[in-house]
Amino acid sequence: MDKKVVLITGGSSGIGKSIGTYLTQKGFVVYGTTRNPENYPDFKEFELVQLDVKDVESIQRAVSYVISKESRLDVLINNAGVGITGPIEETPHEEILHVFDTNFHGPVHVMKAVLPQMRQQGSGAIINITSIAGYMGLPFRGFYSATKGALGLITEALRMETKDFGVTITNVAPGDFATNI
């Protein structure tokens, strides 16, 4: 059987890097994404490709690159994200847009980019990394909670939309982790 091909957004550090390293050790073909792969010249765990979840064209390029190299894509792990803290009334509009573009709109665009390939294959899995914060409005983290809650709901809707195509979609909602976000 061919090795499963995995694409992990935010794969250069934190949870994404740990997942990618583990899957590589288990025999998966892993591609991790980062906005600036040139910042990781010594990264050897798996191949890093350029992808900014806030840039739809870079998403298309990265997904096309993986598919052109592997002729398939079996698993997407939507992991890239940013944190934001502060009182809602004092959070600048630009920061609100940034957290929604990164934590919600970006993963949606990545899912839209991989779904045609998965549908064509008749199989695939999408795992969205949400957060326990998406199940409750945490004080001083309201916008972060909102983005993760929205991603959880779109995951639920898309799971029902794609169930007849052989594509499974779920989310994983970790608690606090010491990462660089």
Spans of features found by a protein language model:
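N-terminal Rossmann NAD(P)H-binding glycine-rich loop of SDR-like oxidoreductase domains
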Residues: 12, 16, 20
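Substrate-binding pocket helix/loop in short-chain dehydrogenase/reductase
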Residues: 87-88, 95-100
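The beta1-alpha1 cofactor-binding region of Rossmann-like NAD(H)/NADP(H)-dependent oxidoreductases
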Residues: 51-61, 93-94
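Active-site loop immediately N-terminal to the catalytic Tyr-X3-Lys motif
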Residues: 89, 136-142
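A short, exposed helix-loop element centered on a Lys and neighboring polar residues
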Residues: 111-112, 156
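Residue(s) in the substrate-gating loop at a strand-loop-helix junction
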Residues: 131
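Active-site helix of classical SDR
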Residues: 111, 147-150
